[in-house]
């Protein structure tokens, strides 16, 4: 879908604020890869020829027009109307709310009203431009972002209710199209409260975690964070009054995205800006997570090959026709449609997909996303996780064999020092690698990283509820247990626990734990992600673990795109042709260096190490 932006200079007298608005809008659209054309008096004729039915035309209103050039703009707009393109007028000033000429019946985007409801003046017009850009992005990339996104406000009532109420009320004013959820408001009298909360969590596009001092004590908060992270629903972490991050059992990232004091939320001017910042950051998180879906396009194309055809590229709808197995006599192919979503899909999406396809001969229609853990059928459409969809089709078509029980893959990782939004990429990578490893029959082995423990435990329970303990091996040095029998009992209940005797100091204890974890014949690969970069390279745990693996000829795979130490190590090995790291192809190592399709990386790695067995 193309977006055509008519320069304010062509339709307005005073363009100062319109230029500021336009500049920020264009920046946002370019940042997210929207195909756009800026129309000026030199390009207007050429652009008119390129307008198609699915185009969007942005035009700025003026209440008094005397420019000759406007006649050419009117001709362009007439052409757009003939092509059934969408025309979106923008009113910078309240006097210009009604467009002039052939589009006088169109509803304008009212910038003045957006500023008014925030009690802001034109100096803040860039904020409104970002909001308008989100509307365009929702239309251009409908499976990645939805203008009517649902926002789940996760908070502890005892010390977070007043703050959350302020946020909720202001969202209703500043983002009328969004649907925030606050349990005390949105759960009706007589409803089964937890059922409603669970349903709204499942339908959410983003969680906003209001981290107050008492949040860490709540099992409900822990449940909500687990729910979001396992379904790869983005979590915007908002820390209040420097609440202690170290006592959280599950952290969405290494550090909070935003930090405020309680008093900030009772200052009206600050509150308006806080909510806009939250909404913009939430949007960035949603888009960052949604963009990861693009990697699965190539993965499924490689899987199905000529058995797949594109139905609608922009809406990511595909049709597959695969020979049916397991019967002696001829029979028709399996016919299936699927649509891929980066955002959280809804029942309305299923209804639209059914209506658009209108094919009663298909065996099934599926909506695929990385937001789903368990398959369900709604509106006669199968809602399934992309990883599970790939895994089952791969098993069916290739009849691949799972790894045997004595085969392990070690995951090594720690949060790098980078922007908090992108630190969530490490959590995403950990989840996807863990799912791929366990689903393919390997055991997942790791050193007792406190944040990763809960993630790996929950993933193992989801995939193998009957024998999850056998799927995850956790190594820990006695240095960290300190005769804590309660903590040890918790670990034994969740994992295959291996305790390693502590040595004279912390560094020696860590080395011994890593050596015992890695240097075993059962270990078939080491995967390194993130890690802190230190002045003394010898203190970087990832480098020590790689050296231990190399001494046993264990292949090492280093993920570069999550940043941190693994990024530096990957570049170093690239410069020497990946020598000594593994015997995989240059292409696969390059994919680990700069790719973001972590599930595909994990599958390719498993294929490689399986072929070497």
Model-derived regions, located:
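Short hydrophobic segments within beta-strands
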Residues: 5-8, 90, 153-156, 238, ...
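C-terminal interaction surface of TIR/SEFIR-family domains
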Residues: 2-28, 64, 91-170, 241-404, ...
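Conserved beta-strand-loop-alpha-helix hinge of the TIR/SEFIR fold
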Residues: 9-10, 48-97, 198-246, 323-331, ...
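A short acidic (Asp/Glu
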Residues: 14-19, 68-71, 100-101, 163-165, ...
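Short, hinge-like loop/turn segments at secondary-structure boundaries
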Residues: 105-107, 197-201, 248, 252-258, ...
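Conserved BB-loop
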Residues: 17-49, 64-69, 168-198, 213-221, ...
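Acidic/glycine-enriched connector segments
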Residues: 27, 31-32, 45-48, 54-59, ...
